[in-house]
Amino acid sequence: MNPVPEEVIWCYGEWQLGYNQLKREGVIFTEGLPKVEEWSTNKRRLVILDDLMSETDDRVTKLFTKGSHHRNISVMYIVQN
């Protein structure tokens, strides 16, 4: 990814032991969806949505559209069965 994000925020539905290594490497973890409207636009952020299929509401749509475009955010959505 270029330019490299200044922050990586991993949003999860259920904590997994594998997250501990990522946390040691500086990844920020939050349970559920973040309140991106509170974030400043001066940082490049990568937001990863993991295991949040039940959170498919208007906040997810805004994160992918207005949130990413106007707040300097790139979004990845991890979906697996």
What are these regions (language model features)?
Residues 1-6, 11-17, 24-81:
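Conserved P-loop NTPase motor cores
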